[in-house]
A protein has these predicted regions:
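Alpha-helical scaffolding within the catalytic cores
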Residues: 14, 214-225, 263-268, 293-298
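Extracellular serine-dependent O-acyl
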Residues: 277-345
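Conserved SGNH/GDSL esterase-like catalytic core that processes O-acyl groups on lipids
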Residues: 151-251, 286-289, 326
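Active-site segments of SGNH/GDSL-like serine hydrolases
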Residues: 234-243, 262-297
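A structural motif corresponding to the C-terminal end of an alpha-helix
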Residues: 162-176, 265-277, 299-305
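Solvent-exposed, polar/charged alpha-helical surfaces in well-ordered, non-transmembrane soluble domains
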Residues: 167, 171, 260-267, 293, ...
């Protein structure tokens, strides 16, 4: 048997991962992941959960087969047997964070009965996302609920970032991605649904954070933008902003403030990243068209060849509940086509 600690060079980390403690890196955002290969007949992981809700789980993908593992909903290190009786050969492995602010977790070690090897995956394209629950992959696994409201009291059981359009698109394009998305996120603080109802927190607070959950044991920590420079940034904000005042966006004075903050963040990212391409979107989740109209105004006001505004075929009209994996894939396919025809040509 061999135990490989988290600081082993064979592990590669993707996403805004806290690497300050090399032997216990913290996976924070939905979709953050660890990749490697291993030779062996079983896989056991040691993780330290940091729960912030009633249910938390993670997943491991071994040679394309996904294993969901429910975590002990308490602080502290625990061992998780992922798979046994595997063929004694080299396996590809991805360990990833399924959910957003339900928890963070520290990766401690991997145990198997063979060798640990680095992943062979290479990326020619880098993506980054800023979005809400749809982008984070919430309730994607509630199959047969397409075009319907979410199951009652689902409690995060159906959340899976692997089936979000964000990760689906990255796989289709063979791209690396950082997904900085959170359910309920809006643009402004004191709007949306994240950390409500008394401490509503928006993208204006989270976009430049590593640890972005105000009530987490880690608090808020700053992100070092030099760690990752994307080629394409997908900005998916505007579907939670109607709370608590759905009519505010119709007021021209408020709309001007909203657009100015949106542009302020976008232009800061544009400067930090040396002018990547931006795609401004909402999603197929039902919402008022006024938000897409305001985003189109932003695109026109910026008047930049680096900034695109994309509307899905069923934009704002496909489902009253979170998009399921089929609906997420619909979005990923459309974005793939748009990117290949307009940016990667």
């Amino acid at each position: 048997m061999a135990i490989y600690t988290a600081d082993n060079k064979a592990f590669s980390y993707m996403g805004r991962v806290d690497l300050s403690e090399t032997k216990a890196p913290v996976l924070i955002y939905a979709g953050s992941n660890i990749k490697c290969r291993f030779k062996g007949t079983f896989l056991k992981l040691t993780l330290d959960n940091i729960p912030m809700d009633k249910f938390s789980s993670f997943s491991a993908v071994i040679d394309g087969v996904q294993y969901r593992v429910e975590m002990k909903n308490e602080n502290g290190t625990a061992e998780y047997m992922i798979a046994e009786n595997l063929e004694d050969t080299i396996h590809n492995l991805t360990i990833f964070k399924r959910q957003a602010a339900a928890h963070y977790f520290r990766f401690i070690s991997l145990e198997t009965d063979g060798e640990l090897l680095p992943s062979e995956e290479k990326y020619d394209l880098k993506l980054e996302y800023y979005g809400d629950s749809v982008s984070a992959g919430e309730v994607t696994e509630a199959i047969y609920y397409e075009a319907h409201q979410d199951p009652e009291n689902h409690g995060g059981i159906y959340d899976n970032s692997y089936f979000s359009y964000t990760w689906l698109l990255a796989r289709k394009l063979g791209a690396e991605f950082y997904n900085n998305s959170q359910g309920g996120l809006s643009l402004f603080d004191k709007t949306g649904y994240f950390y409500g109802p008394d401490h509503l927190t928006g993208l204006e607070t989270t976009y430049n954070k590593l640890s972005y959950v105000p009530y987490s044991p880690l608090g808020l920590t700053d992100w070092d933008f030099s760690r990752y420079t994307p080629d394409i940034v997908i900005f998916a904000i505007g579907q939670n902003d109607a709370n608590p005042n759905p009519k505010a966006i119709y007021d021209e004075e408020y709309a001007k403030k909203w657009k100015e903050k949106y542009k302020e963040i976008l232009l800061e990212l544009k400067e930090r990243y040396n002018s990547p391409k931006f795609i401004l979107i909402t999603t197929v989740l039902e919402h008022e068209k006024i938000w897409d109209e305001r985003i189109e105004e932003i695109r026109a006001e910026l008047n930049s060849s680096d900034v695109y505004h994309y509307l899905f075929t069923r934009n704002g009209a496909a489902t009253p509940g979170h998009p399921r994996v089929t609906e997420q894939n619909e979005m990923a396919l459309e974005l793939e086509k748009f990117i290949r025809e307009n940016i990667l040509r």
